[in-house]
């Protein structure tokens, strides 16, 4: 099992928590709305890659900067993170909400990426479909937006006692 270290990285005046483990080509994992953690699959990937898992601004122990207003701000921020870490030919993995960020990053600078992998990506723009901004919604509304099946959203809620699923 590969050990992951935790450090703090400051970029554009914003301090974010960064987990890193393994060796090899860089593989950046952008977490979903539930937060950053070292997942079992990341342990396996760290056997072949230098796995880098930043915690998004506004999540967990990372700062919430005044300039953070939308998903586009996060995409540009992560391009600056890649610069700060001096990463090239990055394998970028986006999980759920992180998939949205990864997609926005990729359309802004494909030259930095060796690959793009999206897992259950949220927030992708489709013509005729309302685009939701999770920064403008409360925790319960975000869960309702992200999960069609309310039982799944209930299982993922940290506040189960106050959560009331609705039928679709």
Report the location of each language-model feature.
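Conserved alpha/beta-hydrolase "nucleophile elbow" surrounding the catalytic nucleophile
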Residues: 31, 90, 94-99
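Conserved HGGG/HGGXW glycine-rich cap/lid loop of the alpha/beta-hydrolase fold
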Residues: 10-63
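Conserved catalytic-core motifs of eukaryotic protein kinase domains, centered on the activation segment
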Residues: 39-40, 62-68, 127-130
């Amino acid at each position: 099992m590969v050990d992951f270290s935790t450090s703090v990285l400051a970029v554009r005046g914003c301090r974010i928590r960064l987990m890193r483990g393994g060796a090899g080509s860089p593989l950046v994992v952008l977490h979903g709305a539930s937060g950053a953690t070292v997942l079992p699959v990341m342990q396996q990937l760290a056997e072949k890659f230098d796995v880098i898992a930043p915690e998004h601004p506004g999540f967990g122990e990372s700062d919430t900067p005044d300039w953070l207003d939308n998903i586009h701000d996060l995409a540009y921020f992560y391009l600056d993170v890649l610069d700060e870490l001096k990463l090239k030919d990055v394998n970028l993995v986006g999980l759920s909400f992180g998939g949205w960020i990864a997609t926005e990053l990729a359309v802004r600078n494909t030259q930095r990426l060796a690959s793009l992998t999206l897992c259950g990506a949220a927030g992708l723009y489709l013509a005729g479909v309302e685009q939701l901004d999770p920064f403008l919604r409360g925790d319960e509304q975000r869960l309702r937006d992200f999960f069609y099946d309310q039982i799944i959203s209930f299982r993922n809620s940290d506040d189960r006692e106050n959560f009331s699923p609705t039928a679709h």
